Amino acid sequence: MTDEQKLAEFEARVARGDKVEPGDWMPEEYRKNLIRMIGQHAHSEIVGQLPEGKWIPYAPGFRRKLTLIAKVQDEAGHGQLLYRAAETLGKTREEMMEELLSGKAKYSNVFNYPTPTWADVGVIGWLVDTAAVINQSMLAQGSYGPYARAMKRICYEESFHIKQGYDAVVALAKGTPEQKAMAQDAINRWWYPTLMMSGPPDSMSEHTARAMRWRIKTKTNDQVRQEFVDHIVPQIRALGLDVPDPECRYDEATGHYKFTPPDWEELKRVVNGDGPMNKERIAARKKAHEEGRWVREALAVGGTREKSEIRNPNIETNANC
């Protein structure tokens, strides 16, 4: 079978809604696009622990602390799950981590902004994770089996994170005037970074058309962004809080909310490493990576020894080791 025939058969399978599995033939560009997307997603989960994780020691109350610890642990697990999905495409975890630490790999823009108040934790959990779940629910319908299955599990856990964030914001919105003002300030700061999460507008996206063709994605960036706005605006206003966009209004003709687009030049700067917290985020990951080196080396030695013992079952081992 020629490459053209293989491609035609592949695209027919994808168009039918069949899942592509690791051992299946796939176009090289499909594989590369998936590695890029899944790698960026995994990096975002790992780096995404940092903005909220700093608030664990200062969380207001034992229950808030426990839920925040659980959320940060979930994000670490999501990152590992996604790295494993990328490994099925031939990219090693070590390669992906090196690309992150060297600044070569990209991750979500939204994690490069500061979190100066407790309200930021609530707004990230509510707004940012809602935007993430809307995007990830779409990815769960995608054509690559390991990625789609990972998305289903991640969305289930992220729904808990949304509830955690929403509950925190509700408490602030119903609290003192100072607490409500803190919640509003956080929404003001996170609104546009959250809108940017879906990626550049379709007219500027170099990857969307091919990702849609091969069902790596089933909705465009603009469609996902609009779905988020339609979902979240009524919730914000129901709490007596404001959407920080005077042009945001419901359009009866379209059935959607109109809104002011983000500054796409800002998105480009932040994604390319020039955001408010890019350097600090990568520095924190480098520090954690270096401090965890002994664990990785110990696991590698243990794995080598175990393989050796499997190959040589007659080797005597010290039971006291």
Give a label for each model feature.
Residues 1-21, 43, 95-105:
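Acidic, low-complexity proline/glycine-rich segments
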Residues 19-39, 99-125, 142, 175-179, ...:
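Acidic/His metal-coordination segments adjacent to aromatic residues that form catalytic metal sites
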Residues 181-306:
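Extended, helix-rich structural scaffolds rather than catalytic motifs
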